[in-house]
Amino acid sequence: MDTTSLRAAAIVGEAEINHAIATLVLAFGTDPVARWMYREPDQYLLRAPRLFRALGASSFAACAAQRTSDGLGVALWLPPAVAGDDESLEAVIAESVVKEKQADVGAVFERTERYRPTEPHWYLSLIGVEVLHRNKGCGAALLEYGLRQCDREHRPAYLWSSNPQNTSLYQRHGFEVVATIQVGSSPPIFPMFRRTR
């Protein structure tokens, strides 16, 4: 994959944002945490787009969302000093997650924040590739594209992996697992940190 063909999704308008959200819905359809939050397929398809929009709003606004030129992969970054929209995220959780899981889901998000660096850093909030196009280097290309920005600025990076199958990809790009989080019936979640380069 030619990483020079990536561009910021936010600068091309609402149609590109909608396409990015749809790509993420397809990409996370088998993700352990996403499917723990929305177990039933119809509920996942109905509610996940709103969740991803809330998680990505600040990234889109900051022009820090990248997609592959074909739109099959998406990475949503938060630059240093740009915060996510916690209020919108909390509202989405309250309105879309079954009541029995809301406290655990909120606790998962809160605990992932505990491991974020206190120094200015880039935060990879979501990265996903459509299922039929995985294992072709798309995710790695998106990751490398974002990490080049981190390296140009000499900034660390943070993410949390919701799927243990993806931790090796992140490790190959310099991330280290710093903890394992599990709340109630949640699957394990792995906060990961990449030092300044």
Locate each region found by the language model:
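Conserved N-terminal entry element of GNAT/NAT acetyltransferase domains
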Residues: M1-N18
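Active-site rim helix/loop that mediates acceptor-substrate recognition in acyltransferases
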Residues: P41-A64
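Conserved beta-hairpin
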Residues: A57-W77
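Conserved acyl-donor/pantetheine-binding loop and adjacent beta-alpha core of acyl/acetyltransferases
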Residues: D70, V74-E130, R134, V183-S185
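Conserved GNAT acetyl-CoA-binding A-motif
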Residues: P120-Y123, Q149-S162
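Conserved beta-strand-loop-alpha-helix junction that forms the acyl-donor binding cleft
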Residues: L126-R134, Y158-T167, G184-P187, R195-T196
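Conserved acetyl-CoA-binding loop-helix of GNAT-fold acetyltransferases
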Residues: V129, N135-R148, R172
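Conserved active-site alpha-helix within GNAT-family acetyltransferase domains
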Residues: A140, R152-H154, N163-T180, G184-P187
